Amino acid sequence: MLQPKRTKFRKQQKGRNRGLAHRGSKVSFGEFALKATGRGRITARQIEAARRAMTRHVKRGGKIWIRVFPDKPITEKPLEVRQGKGKGNVEYWVCQIQPGKVLYEMEGVSEELAREAFTLAAAKLPVTTTFVKRSVM
């Protein structure tokens, strides 16, 4: 699963997920892409589950790019532990998603196959998404 090799600090504050994605909002590598239309956070497990669903559907044909990386640690305290005594341990990593962010890209397959693969991937993700094609300038 994806997670940073090393970070400056082990734990982060919660923060707020506001605004739109201006960076990473264009199709840069492939021909087709899955773009987020809602906001939320995607865990490393969800990123991997969606990638596996797409890869299996296209039968290892074409190329897939993952455009998001989980770089935010989420901490949790164990069950039945009272509040206080410091912040909990890092349990998993997430990527915060704003509307407009490109999540995955694909090339080397037909549009129909790409749409089907992205539909399978979208079912694994907690944010609403849409299918987009590279715009020719």
Curated annotation (Swiss-Prot):
Pfam families: Ribosomal_L16 (PF00252). GO terms for biological process: translation. CDD domains: Ribosomal_L16_L10e. It comes from the Bacteria. GO terms for cellular component: cytosolic large ribosomal subunit. Residues 1-22 are annotated as: Disordered. Keywords: Ribonucleoprotein, Ribosomal protein, RNA-binding, rRNA-binding, tRNA-binding. One of its GO terms (molecular function) is structural constituent of ribosome. Binds 23S rRNA and is also seen to make contacts with the A and possibly P site tRNAs. Belongs to the universal ribosomal protein uL16 family. NCBIfam families: rplP_bact. This is Large ribosomal subunit protein uL16. The gene is rplP.
